[in-house]
Design a protein with these regions (language model features):
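Amphipathic, non-membrane alpha-helical rod segments
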Residues: 1-9
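TRNA-recognition modules of translation machinery and tRNA-sensing kinases, especially anticodon-binding
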Residues: 6, 13-305
Length: 305
């Protein structure tokens, strides 16, 4: 810098050559200074690393165990995959529903216990958290012209909380509307579902039951997968309560009143519907003793999947 300040006293004919020389020396000095600073920084970093209480040359720790789907999600997806492979399409709908779609159009009488404040979660007058995904059946039948075949997976809500019930649970509704649909078609779909989901040779039986939205109605049992002998018979166990059978869902032929409430002619169209609780099916498939285990998020339990 001092030399550059004295350039004014240098003769004009030598000023150019001396200026170039000064610039060259300046760049060389500044470069050497920068290199030295980098070397000092590296030396300081190396000293810190050598003094560290750990060896950076050691191999990295094993990666954390990979995540996996929750048992409820896995079972739901398995059920949906089976039913979609049988020709059903997925249909979605709201969890906050009007009373008429959740109860009225499904044939529930006004004094049915399910409509009580003690059994359902009401938000405001005429609105509640859906108690089943059958509300999607009403919405689909109101907005789609038959024939149709849908499944409706989703969360549902009821005032229930014990070892086998949860106030929030997941359900899958399956329904088909076409001409000349009979109980034989329903039983065929259920048998194929049980075969694919629970395993080859799983027997299915239907027991008469009552539901407001189907006629006739039935409860569906499958042969207990936990006590099956080599010859196909069941020995009876704690899961099936020594009966050899486990209830998994309710079903039936869609009631004519339901068709009429959706503007569909029951003289021309018929259909079936069935609904299952995903948690219930998961309990059956995996022998889970308490439904609350599915919601406690205990890593020891979830890792078993």
């Amino acid at each position: 810098t001092g030399i550059l300040k004295q350039m004014g006293s240098v003769p004009a004919d030598a000023r150019k050559s001396i200026g170039e020389l000064v610039d060259s020396v300046k760049q060389e000095v500044e470069g050497a200074f920068a290199d030295r600073l980098k070397a000092l920084a590296r030396a300081e970093r190396d000293a810190d690393l050598n003094a560290a209480p750990f060896d950076l040359t050691l191999p990295a720790r094993a990666p954390a165990p990979p995540g996996h789907p929750h048992p409820i999600s896995r079972v739901r997806d398995e059920i949906v995959d089976v039913l979609v492979s049988l020709g059903f399409a997925v249909h979605d709908g709201p969890e906050v529903e009007r009373e008429e779609n959740n109860f009225g159009k499904l044939g529930f009488p006004p004094d049915h216990p399910a409509t009580d404040m003690q059994d359902s979660f009401w938000t405001t007058d005429g609105l509640l958290l859906r108690t089943h995904t059958s509300n999607i059946q009403i919405r689909a039948m109101t907005t789609h012209a038959p024939p149709m075949a849908f499944i409706a997976p989703g969360a549902t809500y009821r005032r229930d909380d014990d070892a086998t019930h949860s106030p929030m649970f997941h359900q899958i509704e399956c329904f088909l509307v076409d001409e000349h649909v009979t109980m034989a078609h329903l039983r065929g779909v259920l048998a194929e579902f049980a075969e694919r989901f629970f395993g080859s040779g799983t027997p299915v039986r239907l027991r008469p039951s009552y539901f407001p939205f189907v006629e006739p109605g039935a409860e569906v049992d499958v042969g207990c997968p936990f006590c099956r002998r080599a010859d196909g018979t069941r020995a009876g166990c704690s899961v099936c309560k020594k009966t050899g059978w486990i209830e998994i869902l309710g079903c039936g032929l869609i009631h004519p009143v339901v068709f009429e409430s959706c503007g569909i002619d029951p003289e021309k169209w018929t259909g079936f519907a069935f609904g299952m609780g995903v948690e219930r099916v998961a309990i059956v498939k995996y022998g889970i003793p308490d439904i609350r285990l599915l919601f406690e998020n205990d890593p020891r339990f979830l890792a078993q999947g």
